Amino acid sequence: MRTTPMANASTIERKWLVVDAAGKTLGRLSTEVASILRGKHKPTYTPHVDTGDHVIIINAEKIELTGKKLTDKIYYRHTQHPGGLKSRTALEMRTNYPEKMLELAIKGMLPKGSLGRQMFKKLNVYRGSEHPHEAQKPEVYELRG
């Protein structure tokens, strides 16, 4: 009897991919990177196994937002103290914390739970065009569209 082959930790081939964020739209870049982290671009995709590749995003400070989102979109965080709700606009986030801006967008598109946290660990975001992962011999990945 034939059975459908299921991926497991020992059969997964992981690659390192470099994505250049310069001039790309935040949401469109994030959806594609989240899909790569999940492994949905592979024929061996299995929902309950982390089959995704490692992704390195460079030039995070050059990410684009459409419309008036730079001034109107607000990122909230809480200090866990009474009255500790803090807010920043997308422009402040892109200027001071562009890595965090991309990480938050991608993390929201991954599964919630231990598997999603494991997938998120394979994401590396850097502000400039340099990254410390040359030893892994990453391949340049061109986004669709």
Curated annotation (Swiss-Prot):
<comment type="function">
    <text>This protein is one of the early assembly proteins of the 50S ribosomal subunit, although it is not seen to bind rRNA by itself. It is important during the early stages of 50S assembly.</text>
</comment>
<dbReference type="InterPro" id="IPR005823">
    <property type="entry name" value="Ribosomal_uL13_bac-type"/>
</dbReference>
<comment type="similarity">
    <text>Belongs to the universal ribosomal protein uL13 family.</text>
</comment>
<protein>
    <recommendedName>
        <fullName>Large ribosomal subunit protein uL13</fullName>
    </recommendedName>
</protein>
<dbReference type="GO" id="GO:0006412">
    <property type="term" value="P:translation"/>
</dbReference>
<dbReference type="InterPro" id="IPR005822">
    <property type="entry name" value="Ribosomal_uL13"/>
</dbReference>
<dbReference type="InterPro" id="IPR036899">
    <property type="entry name" value="Ribosomal_uL13_sf"/>
</dbReference>
<keyword id="KW-0687">Ribonucleoprotein</keyword>
<comment type="subunit">
    <text>Part of the 50S ribosomal subunit.</text>
</comment>
<dbReference type="GO" id="GO:0003729">
    <property type="term" value="F:mRNA binding"/>
</dbReference>
<dbReference type="GO" id="GO:0022625">
    <property type="term" value="C:cytosolic large ribosomal subunit"/>
</dbReference>
<dbReference type="GO" id="GO:0017148">
    <property type="term" value="P:negative regulation of translation"/>
</dbReference>
<keyword id="KW-0689">Ribosomal protein</keyword>
<dbReference type="Pfam" id="PF00572">
    <property type="entry name" value="Ribosomal_L13"/>
</dbReference>
<dbReference type="InterPro" id="IPR023563">
    <property type="entry name" value="Ribosomal_uL13_CS"/>
</dbReference>
<dbReference type="GO" id="GO:0003735">
    <property type="term" value="F:structural constituent of ribosome"/>
</dbReference>
